[in-house]
Amino acid sequence: MVNQKNLLVFILTIGVFGILNTEMGVIGLLPSIAEHFHVSASTVGWLVSSFALAVAVSGPIFPLLFSGINRKKVMLLVLGVFVLGNVVSIFTTNFTIALVARVVPALFHPVYCSLAFTVAAASVSQEEAPKAVSKVFIGVSAGMVIGVPIASLIAGAASLQMSMVFFAAVNIMVFIATLLFVPSMPVEERLSYGAQLSVLKKPATWLSIVTVILMNSAIFGVYSYFAEYLKTVTNMSSNTISLMLFIYGGANIIGNVVAGKLLINSAIKSVVSFPFVLGAVYIIMFFTGQLSVPMAIITLIWGILAGFGGNMNQYLMTSSTPEAPDFANGLFLTSANLGVTFGATVGGFFIAEMGTQYVIFVGLLSLVLSFVAILLRNYMFTLTRSLSR
């Protein structure tokens, strides 16, 4: 029984990796894709931005719509849509078709990811749920960070089409594994759409949404410009920058493992302490950003904190709305994407007005606001629980 549950969580982790790999893997391929389709750099950027926008829009809607359907069937549907999109991307010579082949699967992205978090949490006891979810988050981190260099390596060694084959192969393998090894998972207690939407009446839900947006803004507002920061402030070479990004990605995975333990044993203390610890890292980065060795150490610590932060955000959202886990995870994914967009926008403003070094300010500002949101969220969450007794 334990082995079957471990296999289920493993399949979910690889499934999330495949989906995030499809989303993020093209980042390193954009110049090659622009050349292949004979479009400008700004136009090819739509392959990334349109995907993120589709995820943000569908996050609160699609998981809700599919919440009453057998979860195995939903997983197979989503994986099938991604495989189809991957296959179209391999063979199309039309950029518009390639764009559609990404946007349509992107709409289903929150469905699979929210299901993966929900099913992983439900496969163990309530106390062990954060640990199971943290394992799925390893797939998120790997897809976001490791997928990019792997796809770039394949494209450089073989061709652009072969990197697309890599995306498809991962999703096909997960589809087959889901078909063969994941048991049927009918929804036993189906919640009405109204019952799930009613969680939006709770102040703690909205404060959790705000917290997730601000936390992701604090992390990705700086990380979005990390390569530029290392190039212009630290004066690193492109090869060294690639190494630093790998360090960050590996540290992210370590952060997921750490989160699984801390969120079980000391969730509230960890959440309240997080803005101070990350804030200290950013302050040190601001004053030592010109030095390569301190930046390498900072990158390692920052990556671990970022990995923990993703798990923490998901925990904050789902613990506020335990009665509607699928909808809560959809809200988490939307809030997280909005946080990335907000942080990157404000970070770009600081860079344009003050210089690359000052992108740290978007992180610090977001952390101050997120700390206030966390305190309010925890107060409302505690108040709501005491009144419901």
List the predicted regions and their residue ranges.
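Extracytoplasmic
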Residues: 8-41, 59-62, 222-227
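Helix-breaking motifs and short loop linkers at transmembrane-helix boundaries and internal kinks
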Residues: 38, 70, 91-97, 235, ...
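Conserved MFS/SLC helix-loop-helix module at the cytosolic interface between two early adjacent transmembrane helices
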Residues: 57-93
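Helix-to-loop junctions at the C-terminal end of transmembrane segments
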Residues: 59-70, 255-267, 351
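Paired small-residue
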Residues: 85, 96-105, 293-301
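Helix-loop-helix hairpin linking two adjacent transmembrane segments in secondary transporters
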Residues: 97, 126-182, 225, 229
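Cytoplasmic helix-loop-helix junction between adjacent transmembrane helices
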Residues: 101-139
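C-terminal transmembrane helical hairpin of 12-TM major facilitator-type secondary transporters
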Residues: 269-313
